[in-house]
């Protein structure tokens, strides 16, 4: 029994903790707020950004696969053109014996047309990949910016109540009044 009453007497002699106050150091407060906002953005935005990048990666890979299929088709056409070229060369040998040179021109035109077609397809593939990459980067930038703004507004709205707002305004008016008084 004596120990129990001694404990209550001991608690009565403890000093009280300091009171809760408003930190008026704007630079330190903003640094803390920015740290919290950046931490929240990283924590919540990491998953969304990863999903967005994964989706974009799948689209780009799909575009690459499509381009590769086009390339294979073009190579098949090239192989057919080579077979046709061989046939034309055989015919050319026959016509050369007869003195015709028209087949040689047809061969060159066929090779040039196939080469131009391949170059155009390769150029088209490269342009498609470039524009898809640019579009993906722009979408990611826009999404990250929107999430950052929404997160910051949410944090501000949840932390800023009317009483805190009025106290901040009064403190700033006091600071401005002190500056005006010094002039």
Curated annotation (Swiss-Prot):
Protein name, per record: ATP synthase subunit b, chloroplastic
Any one GO molecular-function label of the UniProt entry: proton-transporting ATP synthase activity, rotational mechanism
Pfam family, one: ATP-synt_B
GO CC annotations on file: chloroplast thylakoid membrane; proton-transporting ATP synthase complex
Annotated TM spans: 25-45
Location, primary (coarse class): plastid
Gene: atpF
UniProt-annotated location(s): Plastid, Chloroplast thylakoid membrane
Subunit comment: F-type ATPases have 2 components, F(1) - the catalytic core - and F(0) - the membrane proton channel. F(1) has five subunits: alpha(3), beta(3), gamma(1), delta(1), epsilon(1). F(0) has four main subunits: a(1), b(1), b'(1) and c(10-14). The alpha and beta chains form an alternating ring which encloses part of the gamma chain. F(1) is attached to F(0) by a central stalk formed by the gamma and epsilon chains, while a peripheral stalk is formed by the delta, b and b' chains.
Topology within the bilayer: Single-pass membrane protein
């Amino acid at each position: 029994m004596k120990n129990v009453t001694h404990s209550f007497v001991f608690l009565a002699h403890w000093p009280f903790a300091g009171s809760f106050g408003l930190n008026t150091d704007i630079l330190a407060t903003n640094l803390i707020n920015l740290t919290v906002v950046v931490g929240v953005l990283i924590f919540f935005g990491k998953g969304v950004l990863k999903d967005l990048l994964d989706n974009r990666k799948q689209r780009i890979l799909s575009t690459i696969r499509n381009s590769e299929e086009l390339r294979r088709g073009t190579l098949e056409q090239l192989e057919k053109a080579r077979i046709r070229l061989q046939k034309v060369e055989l015919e050319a040998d026959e016509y050369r014996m007869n003195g015709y040179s028209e087949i040689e021109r047809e061969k060159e035109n066929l090779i040039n047309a196939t080469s131009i077609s391949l170059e155009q397809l390769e150029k088209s593939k490269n342009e498609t990949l470039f524009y898809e990459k640019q579009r993906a980067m722009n979408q990611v930038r826009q999404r990250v910016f929107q999430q950052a703004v929404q997160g910051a507004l949410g944090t501000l709205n949840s932390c800023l109540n009317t009483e805190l707002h009025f106290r901040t305004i009064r403190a700033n008016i006091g600071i401005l009044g002190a500056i005006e008084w010094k002039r």
